Amino acid sequence: MNTKTLIVVFLVCLLVSEVVLARRCGGRGRRIKIKKIVRKLRPIVRVMKVITRMRTSRPRPRLRPCNSSDLQTTSYQVMQPISPKLKSCPVSLAICNRKCSRRGMKGRCQRRECVCY
């Protein structure tokens, strides 16, 4: 079961148990008890709505490997662990920027080598 389903099941069980308990008490107290439960559940429902919005919003773009003839731009290869021989651009770019910033320059990944400019 996924997390959202578990949360919903838990909340429903909680609500049912509270309603049963309130019914045994009977009378006006039952309505007050149910109103309190609903107030407690509202923030949780809001959080669940935010989570579903985040999941259904447009997907984040995947990182593409460096433009090189020996690399293919398939999503399968992007998802594979990066071998030490073939590093993806963002990793190399971060390393290049660190190396070149010591010299007061910017770095660029060019054919898997750092170029300072």
UniProtKB/Swiss-Prot annotation:
Record's subcellular location: Secreted
Signal peptide region: 1-22
Domain of life assignment: Eukaryota
Primary residence: secreted
Tissue expression pattern: Expressed by the venom gland.
Record's keyword terms, sorted: Disulfide bond, Secreted, Signal
A GO term from the CC aspect: extracellular region
PTM entry text: Contains 4 disulfide bonds.
Protein name as it appears in the record: Venom protein TxLP11
Organism of derivation: Lychas mucronatus (Chinese swimming scorpion)
